[in-house]
């Protein structure tokens, strides 16, 4: 006579979760020299490194101009988002590091050139003593959720 015990779906080992895919993206050649990636995509979440006012060879642009440096940083972010088929609407978190909070606050409306005022990402604004190059006034990092 059978004891009534048998394997059921509950008795099996659970299936392992699918492996997460990590894709690394470099916007400019100098990133590898400095030991970082401009972006990392894991599943549908895109993590973009802090972007600064640097041209494609890593040289500072818009020296001394907070609004100009913000636009240059956002242009680099836009290029990275576009390379992944996304735009600023997909940004869900933004962290801004600045060496001069007063100057940043005066120029902060530059953000609205990129974000819809009705759909802003979460944001943190942090003043720091200095960035990697003393000429950089602002560094912007974002996290985006891919469509």
Residue ranges and their predicted role:
Residues 93-94:
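Surface-exposed aromatic
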């Amino acid at each position: 006579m059978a004891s009534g015990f048998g394997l059921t779906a509950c008795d099996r080992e659970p299936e392992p979760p699918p492996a997460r895919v990590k894709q690394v993206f470099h916007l400019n050649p100098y990133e590898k020299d400095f030991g970082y990636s401009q972006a990392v995509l894991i599943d549908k979440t895109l993590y973009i490194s802090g972007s600064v006012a640097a041209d494609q060879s890593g040289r500072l642009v818009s020296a001394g101009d907070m609004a100009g440096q913000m636009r240059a940083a956002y242009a680099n972010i836009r290029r990275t988002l576009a390379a992944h088929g996304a735009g600023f609407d997909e940004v869900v978190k933004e962290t801004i590091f600045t060496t001069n909070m007063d100057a940043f606050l005066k120029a902060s409306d530059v953000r609205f050139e990129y974000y819809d005022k009705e759909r802003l990402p979460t944001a943190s604004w942090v003043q720091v003593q200095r960035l990697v190059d003393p000429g950089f006034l602002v560094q912007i990092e974002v996290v985006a959720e891919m469509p």
